Amino acid sequence: MHAPPLRTLRHLATALLATLLIGAVAAQNVVEISVAHTMTGGAHRDAFDRIIEAFHEAHPTIRIRQIPQDMEIYQDTGLIAMLQSNDPPDIWFQWGGDLVRRDAELGFALDLTDYLAQDGWGDSFLDASWSEGTGTMVGDRIFMMPYAFDVTTVLWYNTDIFAEHGLSEPETWDEFLDIVRTLRAAGVTPIILGNQQFWPLGNWAGHITARVVGMDLFDKALSLEVPFNQPAFEEAFQRFAELAEAQAFNRDLAGLGASESMAAFFQGAGAMHPIGSWLISNAFSSAPDGFSYDAFNTPVIAGGAGDPQSIIGLATGFEVSSRSAHVDEAITFLRFFTSFDHQVAWAEAGRFSPIEGAMAAAEIDVHNKALAELFLDANELVPPPDTGYPVEIADIFYQGAALVAGGLRSPAAALAWIDEQLALVR
């Protein structure tokens, strides 16, 4: 065998070097955008992954790096630790309301108002996206781009269990209590719920309380303008005492996690499960074949000062870091994500898209359609206490409600305890 001519070797080396240089330059030109969120599974995570894959094909010089965290870790310590670090994510998931206000006031979140005003991008969203109740704005400035509307508590129920015991959806609180008693007498756990982190029961407790005392008093108490220990709130907390007396909950209510209780509901461990609209996307991937379920809003509470047909909910969405070195690329991704076709796919994965017309165009689950109609038709939107108000205030309210629902304290004693604890944070 003859050795190749020296000239040929030089040509090969030159070509190889050129290829390496082109690859290095191309790699240097690729921008990475980090996105922190709580989508650890479910149909909506699959849809999000597919949207990112399509984005990479359309924008080969921008790569999306996902930072998923369990929701409870993310909400408690995960997100704030990232935001306070020297390398915060470029984009992160947030709940609308007080947390958006916090992120804006502390300088974490970028003002998105002018970006959304470009090329009619903001006009592609439903009007509810920019209403006070959804929590996307601080004053007249937009700091969170909504990616879904969430009804944060309805009563999901196992339709087979209801049918077996001859039960139908209740219209009033008294009818609801009758259902609870019937199920308990039959040896069925009426309500399966994991309240280890307090918010699952706490959100529902917030809705019940707002229904009884009215939004004005509800807002004043959670804003620390008036005490909780007064007759109107005692009347509201009496509803939790009624649930405790009827043995409505699973015995491990205080120790069970939110995810575990949802999984238990899918397996038939309880007849009802009070939680939000995200159950739908989880049911797509986690509920067994043949699992049949439906939902009803918190029943009408007689004599309540609040709107008897109110819902509890908010917008969730993405914020952009004010410290991001790649704001334009982050906005490019968000515009791609909220484009009509991708939002139709998002809706079909079980999320309530905020984009005009996406829900109507999507082939969506009947449950998702029903909750979308419930959200848009509601005259009053009650903010979840842990997003509409400072978390430290909401947590104390949640713990007080849990004391009553667990049969550990009377309504009056729990309300006195709430005021004592709040005195330390005023």
Feature map (PLM): residue ranges:
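Long, aromatic- and glycine/proline-rich binding clefts that accommodate carbohydrate-like moieties
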Residues: L126-W130, F296-V300, A347-I396, L403
